[in-house]
């Protein structure tokens, strides 16, 4: 096992512990708490993959951080902070929408890279809106916290979330997963729209009908899917 992988996990465990203390003292806001919960799932997955105990890793991580801080000069710390771009937290969903439990009549789940896609295949002929909470840096989506698909009645019928055991994803991973979710929902004659906020930061533009700009590859894939569906409908007739 690579030593850097282990030390990175140990430091992440300790930093999570520090952030947990901030929340326990009621000093963290909602986005801070969202990231804390997401990172907790990620650390559990990484710990299981690496075969490391989180409590022991936290103790070692504390020692690593204390050593770095002891050697770090105040001036160097100021320069580091000044050169690090700040990310923003974007909230399409309310805390209630983000934390609500939901159930599927005909569940379907697919893993697309480091992201897990879930949808209810029983949903048909509905108007659906995709909304997400995520962080942004340089006006581009940086990290997806959670994406959910809502009907006009407010029911949750789909979801995209990072895999706890597979930390880290790119904006292309997110866009590909959104394409898969849209394709799955549209298969049952649902009309899917993407929130303007998500369009702006994921694609850099917005579409008046609520659909994300599609790449030529995505357009060809959707065209093949449509032709296949038409052939099956004719055979059924």
Curated annotation (Swiss-Prot):
<feature type="short sequence motif" description="Nuclear export signal">
    <location>
        <begin position="137"/>
        <end position="146"/>
    </location>
</feature>
<dbReference type="GO" id="GO:0003723">
    <property type="term" value="F:RNA binding"/>
</dbReference>
<keyword id="KW-1262">Eukaryotic host gene expression shutoff by virus</keyword>
<comment type="subunit">
    <text>Homodimer. Interacts with host TRIM25 (via coiled coil); this interaction specifically inhibits TRIM25 multimerization and TRIM25-mediated RIGI CARD ubiquitination. Interacts with human EIF2AK2/PKR, CPSF4, IVNS1ABP and PABPN1.</text>
</comment>
<keyword id="KW-1190">Host gene expression shutoff by virus</keyword>
<dbReference type="GO" id="GO:0039502">
    <property type="term" value="P:symbiont-mediated suppression of host type I interferon-mediated signaling pathway"/>
</dbReference>
<keyword id="KW-1114">Inhibition of host interferon signaling pathway by virus</keyword>
<feature type="region of interest" description="PABPN1-binding">
    <location>
        <begin position="223"/>
        <end position="230"/>
    </location>
</feature>
<protein>
    <recommendedName>
        <fullName>Non-structural protein 1</fullName>
    </recommendedName>
</protein>
<keyword id="KW-1088">Inhibition of host RIG-I by virus</keyword>
<keyword id="KW-1113">Inhibition of host RLR pathway by virus</keyword>
<dbReference type="InterPro" id="IPR004208">
    <property type="entry name" value="NS1"/>
</dbReference>
<feature type="region of interest" description="Disordered">
    <location>
        <begin position="205"/>
        <end position="237"/>
    </location>
</feature>
<dbReference type="GO" id="GO:0039580">
    <property type="term" value="P:symbiont-mediated suppression of host PKR/eIFalpha signaling"/>
</dbReference>
<feature type="short sequence motif" description="Nuclear localization signal">
    <location>
        <begin position="34"/>
        <end position="38"/>
    </location>
</feature>
<dbReference type="Pfam" id="PF00600">
    <property type="entry name" value="Flu_NS1"/>
</dbReference>
<dbReference type="GO" id="GO:0039524">
    <property type="term" value="P:symbiont-mediated suppression of host mRNA processing"/>
</dbReference>
<comment type="function">
    <text>Inhibits post-transcriptional processing of cellular pre-mRNA, by binding and inhibiting two cellular proteins that are required for the 3'-end processing of cellular pre-mRNAs: the 30 kDa cleavage and polyadenylation specificity factor/CPSF4 and the poly(A)-binding protein 2/PABPN1. In turn, unprocessed 3' end pre-mRNAs accumulate in the host nucleus and are no longer exported to the cytoplasm. Cellular protein synthesis is thereby shut off very early after virus infection.</text>
</comment>
<keyword id="KW-0832">Ubl conjugation</keyword>
<keyword id="KW-0922">Interferon antiviral system evasion</keyword>
<dbReference type="InterPro" id="IPR009068">
    <property type="entry name" value="uS15_NS1_RNA-bd_sf"/>
</dbReference>
<keyword id="KW-1090">Inhibition of host innate immune response by virus</keyword>
<keyword id="KW-1103">Inhibition of host pre-mRNA processing by virus</keyword>
<dbReference type="GO" id="GO:0039540">
    <property type="term" value="P:symbiont-mediated suppression of host cytoplasmic pattern recognition receptor signaling pathway via inhibition of RIG-I activity"/>
</dbReference>
<dbReference type="GO" id="GO:0030430">
    <property type="term" value="C:host cell cytoplasm"/>
</dbReference>
<feature type="region of interest" description="RNA-binding and homodimerization">
    <location>
        <begin position="1"/>
        <end position="73"/>
    </location>
</feature>
<keyword id="KW-0694">RNA-binding</keyword>
<keyword id="KW-0899">Viral immunoevasion</keyword>
<dbReference type="GO" id="GO:0030291">
    <property type="term" value="F:protein serine/threonine kinase inhibitor activity"/>
</dbReference>
<comment type="similarity">
    <text>Belongs to the influenza A viruses NS1 family.</text>
</comment>
<dbReference type="InterPro" id="IPR038064">
    <property type="entry name" value="NS1A_effect_dom-like_sf"/>
</dbReference>
<feature type="region of interest" description="CPSF4-binding">
    <location>
        <begin position="180"/>
        <end position="215"/>
    </location>
</feature>
<keyword id="KW-1035">Host cytoplasm</keyword>
<dbReference type="InterPro" id="IPR000256">
    <property type="entry name" value="NS1A"/>
</dbReference>
<keyword id="KW-0945">Host-virus interaction</keyword>
<dbReference type="GO" id="GO:0042025">
    <property type="term" value="C:host cell nucleus"/>
</dbReference>
<feature type="compositionally biased region" description="Basic residues">
    <location>
        <begin position="217"/>
        <end position="237"/>
    </location>
</feature>
<keyword id="KW-1048">Host nucleus</keyword>
<keyword id="KW-1102">Inhibition of host PKR by virus</keyword>
<dbReference type="GO" id="GO:0039657">
    <property type="term" value="P:symbiont-mediated suppression of host gene expression"/>
</dbReference>
<keyword id="KW-1192">Host mRNA suppression by virus</keyword>
């Amino acid at each position: 096992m690579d030593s850097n992988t282990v030390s990175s996990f140990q430091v992440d465990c300790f930093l999570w512990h520090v952030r947990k203390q901030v929340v326990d003292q009621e000093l963290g806001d909602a986005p801070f708490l969202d990231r804390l919960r997401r990172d907790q799932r990620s650390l559990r997955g990484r710990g299981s993959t690496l075969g490391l105990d989180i409590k022991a890793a936290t103790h070692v991580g504390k020692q690593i951080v204390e050593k770095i801080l002891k050697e770090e000069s105040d001036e160097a710390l100021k320069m580091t902070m000044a050169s690090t771009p700040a990310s923003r937290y974007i909230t399409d969903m309310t805390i209630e929408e983000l934390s609500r439990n939901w159930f599927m009549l005909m569940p379907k789940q697919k893993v697309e890279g480091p992201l897990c896609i879930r949808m209810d295949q029983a949903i048909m002929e509905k108007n659906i809106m995709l909304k997400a909470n995520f962080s942004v840096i340089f006006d581009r989506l940086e990290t997806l916290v959670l994406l959910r698909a809502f009907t006009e009645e407010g029911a949750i019928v789909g979801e995209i979330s990072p895999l706890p055991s597979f930390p880290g994803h790119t904006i292309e991973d997110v866009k590909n997963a959104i394409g898969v979710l849209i394709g799955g929902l549209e298969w049952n004659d649902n009309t899917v729209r993407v929130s303007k906020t998500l369009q702006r930061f994921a694609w850099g533009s917005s579409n008046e009908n609520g659909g994300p700009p599609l790449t030529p590859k995505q357009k060809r894939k959707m065209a093949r899917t449509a032709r296949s569906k038409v052939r099956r409908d004719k055979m059924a007739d």
